[in-house]
């Protein structure tokens, strides 16, 4: 049916694996979408992850132009545009707005040694609080510190230092402006007050830069600008349409899954697996690790993440799933569908195989010495048990994170919503329900990040009065997985008596491995 009303929203989702252009109506119905796969990064050196900023923009343009070719009737129905993008991918621009080097993608692992410690009163306070190592780690991780140390000629020419969202926004509206909801990374941002840090804040010492290098910030739901004639020519988006501030991809997933109240937690089963709770109160679950800006104005996402989350499914597929990859080609399906069949006979607990999913080190708990572990092997175990243990281990880790969050926030969770690629797995969602002992719901659309961005636009443009209305009108549950009491009993015992003991018991061994092998580097 050809749309006649001008009340549709174009959401652009620039993720890690693909760029999507999506058209939603005010009911949250996905009218049409185009997905363009992208190469996440290239690696000039081991551990580096970079991509040309123009590559992202070209694929945004391609996704939009393909959308208009496939559905030319939709172009005249668009009332506004919203953008969501991967977090913590950094772009350096010169005085003409031209990228000076490839973007450093969030998956990059380089670190900077020898940064100047935070001094003065802040340095004394961190020393007294035992937080110096945490601040040092943040300094080592900051891309700006690496650029200033190793590519000073680039840093000296940098006029604007932007997240990918800020770069794409500039390409669309011609202004150096970005959403508050996209500020997730190593820049001098005040996460409590949702603005650039005050001049006296320690972050300007930890990551030195001029504030003029950073964009103007606009809260979610407010207008970033209007689509320029040049952007219209390149994307096909009608010029003059408003670009409404949304948020980073994880934040948009949270509201797209309907999680705007603290008793409904959002699990994101993506490359990085996270558990998020939306709160109007600023609470640091881990000291000095702030909650991130929500896609809801003046709210926060309390987030615990497993850096190598459902990346582990890709790891299993690459290392152990060759048979399923071949069969999937013959059966015209994806290997993950066959993995579901593979683990059907595996009992809860994977016959004693327990996995700790720290394939990448952490900051506090797990710490920088952490490694992944699988314990409990016997001669009965097969690939199927390993795959099942991956799904269980990720759910154990996220349950531990949610329990930390509940303790700090003094709120009990009543329901879980799941987004991300892993949300399409019935096995993963049933395991999650059984481990958490909570109902786990799959939203009506897989495109929760794009939907969340569209919800920001819908509220900002007055299609819905507020987020309570937007959630009611635009989000729905497709299927709910209820916990099974007898299965939860097994998982609960394994979680409390085995999984939660693993890290503290293995930590000294991880430290010895690190001392002997030098990996992960100190």
Predicted features and spans:
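N-terminal phosphate-binding loop and adjacent alpha-helix
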Residues: 34-76
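Conserved phosphate-binding catalytic cores of ATP/NTP-utilizing and phosphoryl-transfer enzymes
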Residues: 1-5, 228-237, 247-264
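A polyampholytic, Gly/Pro-enriched intrinsically disordered region
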Residues: 55-56, 120-136, 236-237, 264-266, ...
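Short glycine-aspartate micro-motif
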Residues: 9-13, 21, 77-83, 161, ...
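Glycine/Thr-rich phosphate-binding loops that ligate phosphate moieties of nucleotide
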Residues: 1-36, 42, 79-117, 153, ...
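Gly/Ser/Thr-rich active-site cleft segment
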Residues: 14-16, 27, 127-248, 313, ...
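Phosphate/pyrophosphate-binding loops at sites that engage ATP/ADP/AMP, CoA/4′-phosphopantetheine
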Residues: 60-79, 151-155, 200-210, 233-235, ...
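Active-site nucleophile and cofactor-binding loops and adjacent substrate-binding regions
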Residues: 28, 51, 79-85, 104-107, ...
């Amino acid at each position: 049916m050809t749309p006649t009303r001008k009340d549709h929203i174009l959401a652009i989702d620039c993720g890690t694996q693909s760029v999507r252009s999506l058209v939603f109506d005010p009911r949250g119905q996905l009218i049409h979408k185009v997905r363009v796969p992208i190469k996440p990064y290239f690696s000039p050196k081991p551990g580096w992850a970079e991509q040309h900023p123009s590559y992202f923009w070209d694929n945004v343009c391609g996704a939009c132009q393909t959308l208009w070719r496939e559905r030319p009737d939709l172009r005249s129905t668009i009332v506004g545009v919203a953008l969501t993008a991967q977090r913590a991918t950094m772009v350096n621009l010169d005085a003409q707005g031209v990228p000076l080097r490839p973007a450093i993608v969030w998956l990059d692992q380089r670190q900077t040694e020898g940064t100047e410690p935070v001094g003065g009163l802040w340095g004394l306070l961190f020393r007294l609080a035992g937080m110096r190592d945490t601040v040092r780690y943040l300094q080592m991780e900051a891309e700006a510190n690496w650029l200033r140390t190793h590519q000073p000629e680039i840093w000296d020419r940098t006029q604007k230092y932007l997240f990918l969202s800020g770069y794409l926004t500039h390409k669309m509206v011609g202004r150096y402006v970005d959403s508050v909801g996209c500020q997730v990374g190593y820049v001098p941002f005040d996460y409590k007050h949702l603005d650039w840090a005050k001049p006296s804040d320690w972050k300007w010492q930890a990551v030195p830069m001029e504030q003029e290098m950073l964009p103007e910030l606009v809260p979610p739901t407010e207008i970033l600008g209007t689509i320029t004639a040049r952007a219209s020519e390149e994307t096909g988006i009608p010029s003059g349409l408003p670009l409404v501030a949304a948020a980073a991809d994880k934040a948009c997933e949270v509201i797209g899954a309907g999680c705007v109240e603290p008793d409904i937690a959002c699990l994101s089963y993506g490359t990085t697996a996270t558990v998020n709770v939306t709160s109007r109160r600023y609470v640091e679950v881990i000291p000095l690790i702030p909650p991130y800006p929500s896609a809801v104005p003046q709210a926060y996402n309390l987030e615990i993440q497993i850096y190598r989350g459902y990346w582990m499914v890709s790891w299993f597929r690459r290392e152990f799933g060759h048979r399923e990859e071949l069969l999937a080609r013959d059966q015209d399906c994806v290997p993950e569908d066959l993995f579901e069949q593979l683990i059907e006979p595996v009992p809860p607990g994977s016959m004693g195989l327990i996995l700790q999913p720290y394939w990448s080190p952490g900051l506090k708990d797990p710490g920088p010495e952490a490694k992944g572990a699988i314990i409990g092997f016997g001669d009965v175990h097969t690939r199927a048990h390993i795959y099942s243990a991956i799904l269980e281990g990720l759910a154990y880790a996220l349950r531990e994170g949610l329990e930390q969050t509940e303790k700090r926030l003094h709120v009990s969770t009543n329901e879980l919503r799941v987004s991300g690629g892993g949300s399409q797995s019935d096995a993963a969602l049933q395991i999650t329900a059984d481990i958490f002992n909570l109902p786990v719901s799959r939203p009506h659309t897989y495109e929760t990040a794009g939907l969340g961005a569209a919800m920001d636009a819908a509220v900002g443009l007055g299609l819905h009065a507020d987020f309570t209305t937007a959630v009611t009108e635009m989000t729905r549950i497709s299927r709910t997985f209820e916990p099974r009491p007898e299965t939860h009993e097994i998982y609960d015992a394994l979680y409390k008596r085995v999984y939660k003991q693993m890290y503290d018991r293995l930590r000294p061994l991880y430290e010895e491995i690190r001392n002997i092998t030098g990996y992960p580097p100190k």
